[in-house]
């Protein structure tokens, strides 16, 4: 199971997050990084649901939209896992 504490903190506060926080969150929920070397952004995809993708800038301070996207994407993942009968 993913880092639910981090997800809940991000749900409450959308600002103040960096690329390392996003990396920890996405990886904890099973996303894999598929970034090409020297790319300006990191790209994450979930192996069971390849349409669930995220792009994260390589910055220590990210705009609020990155946290909003992360929360929405992980909520979609949890809904799909629940519908499939898996453990979120």
Model-derived features: where do they sit?
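Basic nucleic-acid-binding interfaces
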Residues: 1-36, 46-88
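Positively charged interface segments
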Residues: 41-45
């Amino acid at each position: 199971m993913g880092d639910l504490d981090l997800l809940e903190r991000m749900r409450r506060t959308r600002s103040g997050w960096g690329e390392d926080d996003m990396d920890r969150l996405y990886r904890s929920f099973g996303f894999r990084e598929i970034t090409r070397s020297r790319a300006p952004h990191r790209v994450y995809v979930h192996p069971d649901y390849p349409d669930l993708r995220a792009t994260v800038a390589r910055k220590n301070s990210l705009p609020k939209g990155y946290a909003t996207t992360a929360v929405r994407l992980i909520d979609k993942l949890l809904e799909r896992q629940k519908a499939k009968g898996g453990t979120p």
